[in-house]
Structures are given as structure tokens and as C-alpha cells.
Amino acid sequence: MSLDRALPPPTAITLVTAPGCHFCEDAHKTLTELTHRDPSLALQLVEAATPLGTALISEHRPAMNPLVLVDGRYFSAGRLPRRKLEALLARRESVAAGGVRNG
């Protein structure tokens, strides 16, 4: 009997950036560091001017750049809220490990 369980798919983090955006640069640096530390995270970088970037901006209508999505859902716009992101990822990790989801 094998104790191996199928690993859940990685958590997809999409970062939609614009040129000259210092919040975008900061978010990119932070998210790159996070994905290097945690292999269960996958970062997708999308330029706002690309067709995909334009579509995501049209769909989510962020007030500021960058737009950050977690598994395709709106997470934030503007300065990346690091503590909020860490809390979300910790909750997702707990649920994936079989814990109870609170909210």
C-alpha cells in the first residue's frame, strides 16, 4: 500500500504589471521570493498592454497597478498587502493539509 497522495495543483498567482510602476516592481520581487521559497506557488507575470493583461484588467477593473490574482480570483490592486497574502496562503495550506477552513 502506497502512502503517496496526489499533491494538490500549485497555487497560481498572476501579477499584471505596467511599465514604470514601482508597486509592480515591489510586488514582482516579493512574489518571486515567495515562489522560490514555496514550490506550491506558481507565478505568472503578465504585462498590462498584452491581450491577456488587457482582458484581465477589463474583467477585474483594478483602481491601481499591479493587479494580483490568486487562482484566477481578485486578490489586490496597488501595493501588495504582504500579511494578507501570507494569511491567505497559510489558510490554503491548512485546507490542503486536511484542516478546517474558517471563512
Q: Which positions does each model-derived feature cover?
A:
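Non-catalytic, surface beta->alpha helical segment in thiol-disulfide oxidoreductase systems
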Residues: L69-G103
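Glycine-/small-residue-rich active-site loops that bind phosphorylated ligands and cofactors
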Residues: H22-F23, A49, S76
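Generic recognition of short, well-ordered alpha-helical segments
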Residues: E25-K29, A55, L80
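Local sequence-structure signature of Cys/Sec-based thiol-disulfide redox active-site neighborhoods
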Residues: S2-R37
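Thiol-based oxidoreductase modules, predominantly thioredoxin-like and allied folds used
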Residues: P39-G53
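Structural micro-motif
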Residues: E59-L69
